[in-house]
Amino acid sequence: MKFELITTQGRARRGRLVFERGTVETPAFMPVGTYGTVKGMTPEEVRATGADILLGNTFHLWLRPGEEIMRKHGDLHDFMNWQRPILTDSGGFQVFSLGDIRKITEEGVHFRSPINGEKIFMDAEKSMQIQHSLGSDVVMIFDECTPYPATHDEARKSMQMSLRWAKRSRDEFDRLENPNSLFGIIQGSVYEDLRDESLKGLLEIGFDGYAVGGLAVGEPKEDMHRVLEHVCPQIPADKPRYLMGVGKPEDLVEGVRRGVDMFDCVMPTRNARNGHLFTSEGVIKIRNARHRDDTSPLDPKCDCYTCTNYSRAYLHHLDRCNEILGARLNTIHNLRYYQRLMEGLRGAIETGTLDAFVADFYTSQGREVPELKD
């Protein structure tokens, strides 16, 4: 992987990730394909929304279908017929989410399979091995996602263990002679001194890119913004910066303003299946009765397949009838909305008009622009 920094405006960055399987324009949003599919979508449909790269889930793909079946197909690209870049998370967040059915130790995580209750163990080495078999273009280190809230001492212990796991991840990645890229994950909860310690340790190990983890786990937005404002300027300018698991459209805008290059989130796809659709004027809840006889498109400013072919009334009808097509059309639109937002941000950075773009984004939704600290 090669990262090219094309231009900047303030802290915002316009760049490009170059992989053997294709180029990713940044800032970029990665649709989430947890089980090797973006729910309800073919790879061709996902690509048509403007996506350059997808995210796959190491934990779930390890449980089903498993490494053996993956190897028989070649790798995840061949298995799901997506011949462009794929980033896989390490499985740490999913294990963290298991709650009472998992036990975290220095060695790794013991847990019971959420599928059949089988006892399973995952550690840094196993995570690297699984991601190697998936053929991931970007591999994420195995880490512990620090819960929120956490005391300073709790966050420190969690962060320091993640640093030790980061070194083990790096060593195993190198032992496997994996030709792809490995990203470190900065932890430390909402504590700036712990974020500093985490980043310093990761830089000493050395990675191809750096993610900010442990955010969007319940902390106030002000804390997320503060952490990004503190951490992003310290990440080497020639390395991509990835904000994990974020988020709402305004979170992407605020992340870009603070120097983030990559994002992922289930929100556009999950919300689509629940009838919550993102538009240039805010969120539309398509199952509300007021859309029953509305012949207008979902978003007149959107060029997606859904908006150019169907009315709000039709989408309302499909949603009320629980038709699969409704979820698919909603997903196409939401993913295209996110990609159009990223395209707009990239163009604004290139032309030096980011401030105006951000102001228009918030004004169209009747909101004020959040403060950006120097």
From Swiss-Prot:
InterPro entries: ArchSynthase1/Queuine_TRR, TGT, TGT-like_sf, tRNA_ribo_trans-like. Signal peptide: none annotated. Zn(2+) binds at C302, C304, C307, H333. Its EC number is 2.4.2.29. Its cofactor is Zn(2+). Belongs to the queuine tRNA-ribosyltransferase family. This is Queuine tRNA-ribosyltransferase. The gene is tgt.
